[in-house]
């Protein structure tokens, strides 16, 4: 890379008496940077989904049209995450991470404040594509940072904690819609409908994301060696089974990264394909629940915003539990943990689909969703799905990081993301939108449930192959 994006050079090691204290302080500091930085990316990752009911209600776009527009996000993000991962592996995350955040926030701010940016399908598709491309600059530098600052035996826990950042950030758009609704009520004296606040759901999070980019730059650092510290493996005396100082600590060529450590890695291919169907459910529920709950389950804008928010909130304890289980109970067996969580996730999606809508004759009996037993059940099931689905999402990214040397970790994770977003997110938007438009919401749920079953089968294969892989290397997880 060049200019400010160039990796920070290694410097002379600090005196021995300063290493421990400096390492501990900088790990907290760097973690704050990647946690709050990545959380801010999620201010503007899926906030467009909350604008969709308003765009439909205002008669501006149909579900099928929004599905086409929304597909740009997955297409762009999948390509970008892979391309940017290769660039990130040879860049300074201190610059790379906040720069992408700034550009992504700018895209959403333009869409919310300037009518030309939402004036037609083509221009909206381009704007969503650009936002998705800049979003691809978020995960790779964070993954690169974690493999340099935390060793293998602690990585499952630290990645699961960090992974909750996107759930924390994902709650912000819903909260901002509630804020916009409150402002509308205070100025107009009537309850806001979806068509009244869709612009705010775009530019409120966009402005917030741009503001967050500034402190992220100041707290981030590149590698430990660029701060005068030894490698994390040396400091913790915790080496992977296949550790080789040349490949782990020295920069690799683009060909070595892509061909040797990605394309020839069979286990990485398995988890990449599984990621397609994990992401299909993750984004199928997230993207279409605001419309589904509004059209079918009779939720108002406040109920929809609360359900969207709790879906992300529930992911925090679910992801932490999944990371802890994979580390402490299953001793690093990511495939087994993901297999169990995806079985439970698919069952929860079936229950969400089967729960009946409130009979229209009874709607007047309930003043809020939490007083309505039908809607309360939907709310609980949304919570359960959010609790379960983000564990496999986290595990696949973590597994990819562990299947390649540190200098190729971002590309390995980008490879799985490429499949997840090109296959899973595009399908969650375009295919589910098309199915719901032409076959009703049952058609949309057939797609999601079928994806859940395929994810379970693929993670079963991963589980079996993972066992063979560990047996071949000698399972010394967490013993060094």
Swiss-Prot record:
Tree of life domain: Bacteria
Transmembrane segments: 37-57, 65-85, 95-113, 122-142, 162-181, 202-219, 275-295, 301-321, 335-354, 360-396, 416-437, 443-463
Location relative to the cell: Cell inner membrane
GO CC, one annotated term: plasma membrane
Bilayer topology: Multi-pass membrane protein
Periplasmic side: 58-64, 114-121, 182-201, 296-300, 355-359, 438-442
Predominant cellular place of this UniProt entry's protein: membrane
CDD domains (alphabetical): MFS_GlpT
InterPro entries assigned: G3P_transporter, MFS, MFS_dom, MFS_trans_sf, OPA_Antiporter, Sugar-P_transporter_CS, Sugar_P_transporter
Chain ranges on the Cytoplasmic side, renumbered to this chain: 1-36, 86-94, 143-161, 220-274, 322-334, 397-415, 464-479
BP term (GO), one: phosphate ion transmembrane transport
PROSITE patterns per UniProt: GLPT, MFS
SUPFAM superfamilies: MFS general substrate transporter (SSF103473)
GO molecular function, a single term: glycerol-3-phosphate transmembrane transporter activity
Record's keyword terms, sorted: Cell inner membrane, Cell membrane, Glycerol metabolism, Membrane, Transmembrane, Transmembrane helix, Transport
Family as reported in the entry's similarity comment: Belongs to the major facilitator superfamily. Organophosphate:Pi antiporter (OPA) (TC 2.A.1.4) family.
Role, per record: Responsible for glycerol-3-phosphate uptake.
Protein name from the UniProt record: Glycerol-3-phosphate transporter
Species of the source: Haemophilus influenzae (strain ATCC 51907 / DSM 11121 / KW20 / Rd)
């Amino acid at each position: 890379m060049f200019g400010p994006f160039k990796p920070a050079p290694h410097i002379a090691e600090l005196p021995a008496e300063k290493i421990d204290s400096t390492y501990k302080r900088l790990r907290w500091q760097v973690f704050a940077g990647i946690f709050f930085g990545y959380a801010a990316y999620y201010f503007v990752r899926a906030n467009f989904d909350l604008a969709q009911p308003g765009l439909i209600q205002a008669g501006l776009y149909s579900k099928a049209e929004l599905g086409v527009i929304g597909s740009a996000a997955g297409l762009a993000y999948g390509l970008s995450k892979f391309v940017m991962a290769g660039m990130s592996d040879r860049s300074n995350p201190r610059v790379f991470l906040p720069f992408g955040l700034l550009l992504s926030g700018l895209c959403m701010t333009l869409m919310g404040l300037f009518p030309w940016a939402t004036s037609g399908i083509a221009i909206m598709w381009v704007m969503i594509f650009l936002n998705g491309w800049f979003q691809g600059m978020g995960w790779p530098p964070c993954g690169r940072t974690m493999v340099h600052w935390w060793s293998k035996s602690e990585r499952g826990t630290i990645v699961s904690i960090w992974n909750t950042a996107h759930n924390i950030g994902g709650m912000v758009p819903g909260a901002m819609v509630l804020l916009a609704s409150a402002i509308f009520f205070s100025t107009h004296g009537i309850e806001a409908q979806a068509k009244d606040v869709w612009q705010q759901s775009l530019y409120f999070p966009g402005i917030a994301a741009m503001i967050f980019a500034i402190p992220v730059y100041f707290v981030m650092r590149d590698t430990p060696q660029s701060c005068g510290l030894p490698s994390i493996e040396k400091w913790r005396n915790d080496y992977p089974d296949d550790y080789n100082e040349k490949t782990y600590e020295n920069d690799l060529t683009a060909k070595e990264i892509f061909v040797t450590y990605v394309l020839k890695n069979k286990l990485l291919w398995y988890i990449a394909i599984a990621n397609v169907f994990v992401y299909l459910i993750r984004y199928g529920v997230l993207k279409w629940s605001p419309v589904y709950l509004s059209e079918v389950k009779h939720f108002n804008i406040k109920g929809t915003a609360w359900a969207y928010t709790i879906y992300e909130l529930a992911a925090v304890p679910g992801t932490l539990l999944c990371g802890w289980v994979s580390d402490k109970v299953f001793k690093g067996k990511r495939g087994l943990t993901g297999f169990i969580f995806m079985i439970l996730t698919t069952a929860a999606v079936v229950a969400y689909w089967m729960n009946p809508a409130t009979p229209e004759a009874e709607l007047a009996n309930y003043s809020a969703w939490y007083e309505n037993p039908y809607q309360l059940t939907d709310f609980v099931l949304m919570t359960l799905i959010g609790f379960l689905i983000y564990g496999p999402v986290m595990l696949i990214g973590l597994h990819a990081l562990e299947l390649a040397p540190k200098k190729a970790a971002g590309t390995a994770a980008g490879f799985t993301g490429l499949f997840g977003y090109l296959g899973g997110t595009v399908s969650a938007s375009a295919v589910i939108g098309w199915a719901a438009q032409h076959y009703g919401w049952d058609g949309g749920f057939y797609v999601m449930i079928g994806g859940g079953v395929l994810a379970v089968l693929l993670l079963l294969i991963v589980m079996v192959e993972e066992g063979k892989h560990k047996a071949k290397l000698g399972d010394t997880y967490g013993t060094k």
